[in-house]
């Protein structure tokens, strides 16, 4: 009977922020639900910190509450993750990414591996800021020459803390020699370039993750 077992599912690393600014509940729920159906999913945060969910609504509050009770809700330490063990990388929209992931040396090491091996990467909304940590020794960005999307300045400027943001993704991407596009604020907008999928905002989570699943499916 052993020979009739289904092949083991590929492993996907879901990286989220551990900062107080948190992780979008809407984006995380869609990421986790869609990805866990296709992958063996491992959640990781800097220091293994518990996730603070923001923008919790009536529609996802129960899911978030149930998730917190599960054993797999305790994230692994990003610092101890070996990127070579994973087939795909998924970063939901995390306002906190600007605080911790955007300057994470551990995530930079993982992203450099994924870039060199052309493994599928998907980053959404504020999670796109996490990609900014991955620079080469000469300070060039590993995604130079790629096309991306992420939060537009028009979306960011509506938040009260805009003036204090440590990083504007749109500016970083353009200054680093990559292409940036954005649609109207809150519109669904996804860019696929080679093995990199980016979504403009939390509303773009589902089609972005579907593109990640498509990329992984086409590699079998």
UniProtKB/Swiss-Prot annotation:
Positions of glycan attachment: 203
Keyword Glycoprotein applies: yes
Keyword terms: Endosome, Glycoprotein, Secreted, Signal
Subcellular location(s) per record: Secreted; Early endosome
Glycosyltransferase listed as a keyword: no
Entry GO terms, CC: early endosome; extracellular region
Main location: secreted
Highest taxon of the lineage: Eukaryota
InterPro entries: Class_I_gatase-like, Prot/Nucl_acid_deglycase
Function: Component of the FERRY complex (Five-subunit Endosomal Rab5 and RNA/ribosome intermediary). The FERRY complex directly interacts with mRNAs and RAB5A, and functions as a RAB5A effector involved in the localization and the distribution of specific mRNAs most likely by mediating their endosomal transport. The complex recruits mRNAs and ribosomes to early endosomes through direct mRNA-interaction.
Assembly and interaction partners: Homotetramer. Component of the FERRY complex composed of five subunits, TBCK, PPP1R21, FERRY3, CRYZL1 and GATD1 with a ratio of 1:2:1:2:4, respectively.
Family named by the database record: Belongs to the peptidase C56 family.
The protein's name in its UniProt record: Glutamine amidotransferase-like class 1 domain-containing protein 1
Organism: Mus musculus
